């Protein structure tokens, strides 16, 4: 059977592929992935197990390296528009780590896009692959049927399973990119709404200050006019008295 399907008897080193964005200004998108990955790493450390983080995105790269976590090669520069070649490069790298025995399990940590208003951080096993059992009507596994393979089934597995790993990584990258755009759209809308509210408040304050200034000037003019009028009356009275 393929090495992709064989679970290791003991998980000594776990590998986490943390998919974040290359840029910020997207609300809590990056922090959710970083917290989830860091939580798994700390749990491994408490269990006396080793770990390795594969950062995807500059935010993950900067976060884990700045805090001196064990990291491997990082993959950056494509978070907003990933291509299949990007997933292929990541897949080949982590599969090579697994086949060489440097890690015993590989997991994806990314943000799953549910809808434009809902995204969730998920952790999905990548290698070894999990087998799905199709249940029959009697509660037992359904019959697989008789199939003829050309070429040999082992050769087909060895060819298709790495492609399957790449496809799953690509799906995770697409989910992450859609989630990043949704988070950024909400963050920018919130910033715009806050800016408009701030403009209204500042305009109200400015108008009030301008009104107070105009009122003060009018009061000064009226007071000055009244003072001048009072002086003129005094002059007339003195002139009449002298006559």
Model regions: which residues?
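C-terminal beta-strand-loop-alpha-helix "lid" module of Rossmann-like NAD(P)-dependent dehydrogenases
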Residues: 1-243
